[in-house]
Amino acid sequence: MIKRLVDIGAVKFGAFKLSSGLESPFYVDLRSVLGEPELFQWVIERYEAVLSGLEFDVIIGVATGGIPYASVLGYRLKKPMGYVRDEAKGYGTGRQIEGADVAGKRAAVVDDVLTTGKSVLNAIRAVRASGGEVAGVVVFLDRGQCGAEAVKREAGVYVYSVYKMRELLEELRPHIGEERYRSVLDYLSQWRC
């Protein structure tokens, strides 16, 4: 199934500018997984395995990449689900968290990919501002660019990942060629967390 991530373009190699502003020789866009039912199921099962080690009352998806995964996980695990907007909306209820109420509850924050940790830190702040506690953050992929360390340092919350980029890269190695493998490995080696 790992090779399917490359086949459908969920993992791409080349020259990319990330939303964080960083330049990268690879790009991960797990939204394309949503159009592949078998692969989507496989990804959800990996999330479930990681979440099974966490005690939580509610699942909170990070907009936008974490929302579809959090939705399915909430349904499958029979947990209330909500999501965090980038910022509180300026109309209606003015809430930043939609869906499940987090007040007095332990939340598992779910996102797809972690780079710098900025989006996840925003979600943690929103959960806490709404009276909730964060039991942990679960991502499918930690790019290995110090985001998990930033979340731990700044918020005191541990990030659990299905894959770290180095692990994913190792599994993809036979499918992407040695030159591409080395290029990404060299890029990742600059991040000392």
From Swiss-Prot:
Binding-site residues for 5-phospho-alpha-D-ribose 1-diphosphate, renumbered to this chain: R85, K89, D111, D112, V113, L114, T115, T116, G117, K118, S119
Record flagged with keyword Repeat: no
Positions contributing to orotate binding: T115, R143
Catalysed reaction, written as an equation: orotidine 5'-phosphate + diphosphate = orotate + 5-phospho-alpha-D-ribose 1-diphosphate
Pfam family, one: Pribosyltran
Enzyme Commission no: 2.4.2.10
GO MF annotation, one: orotate phosphoribosyltransferase activity
This protein's pathway: Pyrimidine metabolism; UMP biosynthesis via de novo pathway; UMP from orotate: step 1/2
Keywords: Glycosyltransferase, Magnesium, Pyrimidine biosynthesis, Transferase
Signal peptide, first to last residue: none
Cofactor: Mg(2+)
EC class of the enzyme, as a word: transferase
Gene3D superfamilies in UniProt: 3.40.50.2020
Keyword Magnesium carried by entry: yes
Record-linked SUPFAM superfamilies: PRTase-like
GO terms for biological process, alphabetical: 'de novo' UMP biosynthetic process; pyrimidine nucleobase biosynthetic process; UMP biosynthetic process
Function of the protein: Catalyzes the transfer of a ribosyl phosphate group from 5-phosphoribose 1-diphosphate to orotate, leading to the formation of orotidine monophosphate (OMP).
Family statement drawn from the similarity comment of this UniProt entry: Belongs to the purine/pyrimidine phosphoribosyltransferase family. PyrE subfamily.
Protein name: Orotate phosphoribosyltransferase
UniProt organism field: Pyrobaculum aerophilum (strain ATCC 51768 / DSM 7523 / JCM 9630 / CIP 104966 / NBRC 100827 / IM2)
Source lineage: Archaea, Thermoproteota, Thermoprotei, Thermoproteales, Thermoproteaceae
Annotated gene: pyrE
